[in-house]
Regions:
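Two-metal-ion RNase H-like nuclease active-site motif
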Residues: 66-76
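Active-site cofactor/substrate anionic-group-binding motifs, chiefly glycine-
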Residues: 74-81, 86-109
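Long, contiguous domain-sized segments
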Residues: 2-54, 60-61, 66, 149-180, ...
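N-terminal functional modules and adjacent low-complexity/disordered segments of proteins
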Residues: 2, 90-92, 142
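Generic enzyme active-site microenvironment
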Residues: 70, 91, 182
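Compact, glycine/acidic-enriched structural inserts
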Residues: 95-151, 155-156
């Protein structure tokens, strides 16, 4: 162990406290970032970095009388000995203030895949009601000809995205459109959309009816929010994209404009740009600006909103919105469905984390909607590290270990050496 520590301590690493002109230049480039003629990133409104004092923000009034959040719990893919992949996902919706009837509603989707086509799931793909109609479940079977690789991942994606989207659509009638809706994770089913937009001979879901139905569900969800002008955000807890950094690094090499770009991901870049001592470009109040270094542990720092294009599909797909399928129906202009986001850095257990907050360009292109959506998220993060209603939804939707073991006991699980060495663990 001493040798391991010695190797680690010998790695040269520097974290410059002072903000260099290069870092400032990086941020300024985010105002409009192109790859050739293609626009990749564009600031919506003014480019800025700012902060709020969490202590003051938590004492302010919430502009929204009710907040909704959705989440889906999963067994995660289970491989059984006769080649059957199975994943069961359980979706729920939470509200603050609490709405017990809404919390009681549940949607369960089970997806199966067997490459030999021998294992058939019971029943049909129609909904089966339970709990006096407050719950419903259905099964999806992926055709064996569609997948040569990524079977476990696809079984999971079908289950989690279907359960989430179907449950949101089912509970929209219970929503007060003057409220605020927080989705767990990105706005759209990113993994599924990638493969729907890729000409792959090994993952042939592009024209699969179930994949199309899932994507149509998400477009229908966004139509509801655009029609009612009801704010919706995707709260991405662990953003890991590299689209912006890849382009910046390419430009740095071609145009010789940066000596060094040390970040591996977009999140690392935003984390550096949002260090508390750097994130005051005039947006903070006079009282907040006077908090000084001693108050940095209470500072929540954030950027302006950005329009982010070309993040879902390969270059052979020309659209920049999720409307890759011509058969998808939608009520608004394609650009309105494009994802916009802002980054926010939050103090967290003697360190800090960066969250990505997504919304629809069709909503946040309105300045007042941008302001209200930003303020709502800052208020939620000042009151707790994760929005309260999102934590509620996570608790309601979670599938416990006992339930997972009960499912496993119905079949013979295919165990590898790692199963015996580490026990039951999740691997997608």
């Amino acid at each position: 162990m001493e040798e391991i520590a010695g190797i680690a301590s010998g790695i040269e690493y520097a974290d410059t406290a002072e903000e260099s002109d290069e870092i400032i230049h990086v941020f300024e480039m985010l105002s409009e970032l192109k790859e050739g003629e293609n626009l990749i990133l564009k600031a919506v409104g003014k480019l800025f970095r700012s902060f709020v004092d969490a202590r003051r923000m938590s004492l302010s009034a919430d502009e929204f009388n009710i907040t909704y959040s959705s989440d889906s719990g999963s067994t995660n893919p289970i491989l059984f000995e006769r080649g059957l992949f199975l994943d069961i996902c359980h979706a729920a919706m939470a509200a603050t203030p609490t709405d017990l009837n809404l919390h009681r509603k549940r949607t369960i989707v089970c997806t199966g895949f067997n490459p030999a086509g021998k294992a058939k799931l019971p029943g049909t793909e129609d909904w089966k009601l339970f709990d006096d109609g407050y719950g419903r479940s259905k099964m999806i079977q992926i055709d064996p000809s569609l997948l040569k690789i990524r079977a476990g991942r696809m079984v999971h994606d079908y289950s989690i995205y279907s359960s989430e989207s179907e449950h949101i659509l089912w509970t929209q009638a219970d929503m007060d459109t003057n409220g605020f809706f927080i989705m767990d994770g990105p706005l759209y089913p990113r993994q599924l959309m990638y493969w729907m937009g890729t000409n792959s001979e090994k993952v042939l879901i592009r024209h699969d009816k179930n994949a199309k139905k899932i994507l149509q569900n998400y477009i229908d969800i966004m139509d509801f929010h655009l029609k009612n002008k009801m704010p919706v955000v995707g709260f991405v807890k662990n953003p890991a994209e590299t689209q912006i950094m890849n382009l910046l690094r390419k430009k740095a090499k071609e145009e010789k404009i940066f000596a060094e770009l040390p970040w591996a991901t977009d999140t690392q870049m935003f984390k550096a740009l949002l260090k508390p001592e750097k994130a005051d470009t005039g947006k903070a109040s006079a009282a907040e600006a006077g908090t000084g270094k001693a108050g940095t542990r209470f500072k929540i720092t954030y950027t302006n909103w950005f329009l982010q294009l070309k993040q879902y599909y390969d270059d052979d797909i020309k659209t920049t919105s999720p409307l890759v399928e011509e058969s998808l129906t939608h009520s608004f202009e394609p650009e309105d469905y494009t994802v916009a986001f802002f980054a926010v850095r939050v103090p967290y257990e003697n360190s800090s984390v960066v969250f990505k907050i997504e919304s629809l360009y069709g909503l946040i292109k309105d300045e007042e909607m941008r302001r209200r959506s930003t303020q709502k998220i800052l208020y939620e993060l000042s009151a707790g590290k994760i929005p309260e209603t999102l934590l509620k939804a996570d608790s309601i939707a979670k599938i416990g270990g006992d339930e997972k073991k009960e499912i496993q006991n119905l079949f013979t699980v295919d165990k590898s050496y790692n199963t015996f060495r580490w026990g039951d663990f999740d691997e997608l």
